[in-house]
Design a protein with these regions (language model features):
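Anion-binding alpha/beta catalytic cores of soluble intermediary-metabolism enzymes, centered on
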Residues: 1-84, 90-187
Length: 187
């Protein structure tokens, strides 16, 4: 299929899943001072393609809707607070739309999750960097989420947290994220 052809050519996307939310990352473990340079039209377009193809191939969501968060406060306010959302994010979204993807944004990230808490969620939200998305996601999921890597030739899931060395061997770990990761990603 066309979706699987695109899926095999793109860089993987870390998708975090919990009941009521799927959140992907355009960049992963990039220092904050380097995030702006890492957000390019190609990087964002590739993440959008991989996310859309993965949602279709792995989760059976035809024609998924993807929301994209802005980089700067208030999604740059039309270039008044940095220009990345105007110069990089908007053109990448337009390009994705011309390819037939259903994308919207950039949305100001400071109020996005509160604003959409009581509305039907999109099929996925793309955060541009790690803490922009994972802070709100972890508040939302309360230990019930997992990480599902999109764009690989085999399914890959994991807990949505790090190694937790601080609690290792103390019998206090919460297994809900591991349980979510073990379930098939086609839920």
């Amino acid at each position: 299929s066309a979706a699987s052809d695109v899926y095999k050519r793109q860089a993987p996307v870390m998708m975090f899943e919990a009941p009521g939310m799927r959140l992907g990352l355009v960049t992963i473990h990039v220092p904050l001072r380097k995030v702006s340079d890492a957000i390019t039209p190609d990087a964002l377009a590739n993440a959008l393609r991989t996310t859309a193809a993965g949602l279709t191939a792995d989760l059976g969501i035809p024609d998924p809707v993807i929301h994209v968060l802005g980089l700067n406060p208030h999604a740059s306010e039309d270039g008044r607070i940095g220009d990345e959302d105007v110069v990089v994010v908007r053109p990448a979204l337009e390009r994705a739309r011309t390819e037939g993807l259903r994308v919207a944004g950039p949305f100001p990230s400071d109020g996005y999750f509160a604003r959409y808490r009581d509305r039907p969620p999109p099929d996925a939200v793309l955060a541009l960097y790690h803490d922009q998305g994972l802070g709100p996601f972890k508040l939302w999921e309360r230990g019930r989420g997992c990480q599902h890597t999109l764009g690989l030739s085999v399914p890959r899931t994991s807990c949505d947290h790090g190694t937790a060395y601080d609690i290792a061997g103390r019998a206090i770990a919460d297994a809900r994220s591991m349980t979510a990761a073990i379930r098939p990603p086609t839920r």
